[in-house]
Curated annotation (Swiss-Prot):
GO biological process entries: methylation; nicotinamide metabolic process; positive regulation of gluconeogenesis; positive regulation of protein deacetylation
Enzyme class: transferase
Keywords annotated in UniProt: Acetylation, Citrullination, Cytoplasm, Methyltransferase, S-adenosyl-L-methionine, Transferase
UniProt protein name: Nicotinamide N-methyltransferase
Highest classification ranks of the organism: Eukaryota, Metazoa, Chordata, Craniata, Vertebrata
Record's function text: Catalyzes the N-methylation of nicotinamide using the universal methyl donor S-adenosyl-L-methionine to form N1-methylnicotinamide and S-adenosyl-L-homocysteine, a predominant nicotinamide/vitamin B3 clearance pathway. Plays a central role in regulating cellular methylation potential, by consuming S-adenosyl-L-methionine and limiting its availability for other methyltransferases. Actively mediates genome-wide epigenetic and transcriptional changes through hypomethylation of repressive chromatin marks, such as H3K27me3.
Pathway: Cofactor metabolism; Amino-acid degradation
Effect seen on changing Y20A: Loss of N-methyltransferase activity
Chain sites annotated for binding S-adenosyl-L-methionine: Y20, Y25, G63, Y69, D85, N90, D142, V143, T163
């Protein structure tokens, strides 16, 4: 299986951040499968970070890609956020938004949606500025390494977040389990692990470019998380899938887990 799995080098050479953003995060067609999934993710992130008490000083977002939607509610609950990705072009795309460069992707429809969820305490521009102020570092990461962020010195995090990343980064189940343990090395004991990802997806498309995904069901994910030294506090599955031209997933899952004080 691994021989046919999209390599890291392919992400560096063929992953186009702008195409990805245009395909999956344009809120223009609110009724598309992609928009429905994005709204679901935003609602769950709001629930986790604004209603359920997942908060603290430091949140590390693993595999941010070129996106910021996953941090719009988190910036209300964490003083500092570190964004990370494997591909340089995704980090560059994030920097464009952080620096308000004119060619940065327009997240304002998504930001407005989150502000509505949060009761319109602030307007979109203020929310964007709050997130920009919260993001303290933009770092390279590789979840398959025992030190996912290399030698960068960071205090143990209160929360590690990963959305739509691990399935694409791990070619097999043992690698997936190791990646979860590697993420645990970034967390303080009792710290939160928040993951959202597709279920049973073997690929996703960006235009004509196909990228591999590790097709895991709920039971495999739950077992891997527990084996990696966490206790699961919340696990939700929805049946909504991406458009058939975009991916072959069978729903998505969201989970909140906590790192055990003593490793298994």
């Amino acid at each position: 299986m691994e021989s046919g799995f999209t390599s890291k080098d392919t992400y560096l050479s063929h992953f186009n951040p702008r195409d990805y953003l245009e395909k999956y995060y344009k809120f223009g067609s609110r009724h598309s499968a992609e928009s429905q999934i994005l709204k679901h993710l935003l609602k769950n992130l709001f629930k986790i970070f604004c209603l359920d008490g997942v908060k603290g000083d430091l949140l590390i977002d693993i595999g941010s890609g070129p996106t910021i939607y996953q941090l719009l509610s988190a910036c209300e609950s964490f003083k500092e956020i570190v964004v990370t990705d494997y591909s340089d072009q995704n980090l560059q795309e994030l920097e464009k938004w952080l620096k308000k460069e004119p060619e940065a992707f327009d997240w304002s429809p998504v930001v407005t949606y989150v502000c509505d969820l949060e009761g319109n305490r602030v307007k979109g521009p203020e929310k964007e500025e709050k997130l920009r102020q919260a993001v303290k570092q933009v770092l390279k990461c590789d979840v398959t390494q025992s030190q996912p962020l290399g030698a960068v010195p960071l205090p143990p995090a209160d929360c590690v977040l990963s959305t739509l990343c691990l399935d694409a980064a791990c070619p097999d189940l043992p690698t997936y389990c190791r990646a979860l343990r590697n993420l645990g090395s970034l967390l303080k004991p009792g710290g939160f692990l928040v993951i959202m990802d597709a279920l049973k997806s073997s690929y996703y498309m960006i235009g004509e470019q196909k990228f591999s995904s590790l097709p895991l069901g709920r039971e495999a994910v739950e077992a891997a998380v527990k084996e990696a030294g966490y206790t699961i506090e919340w696990f939700e599955v929805i049946s909504q899938s991406y458009s058939s031209t975009m991916a072959n997933n069978e729903g998505l899952f969201s989970l909140v887990a906590r790192k055990l004080s003593r490793p298994l």
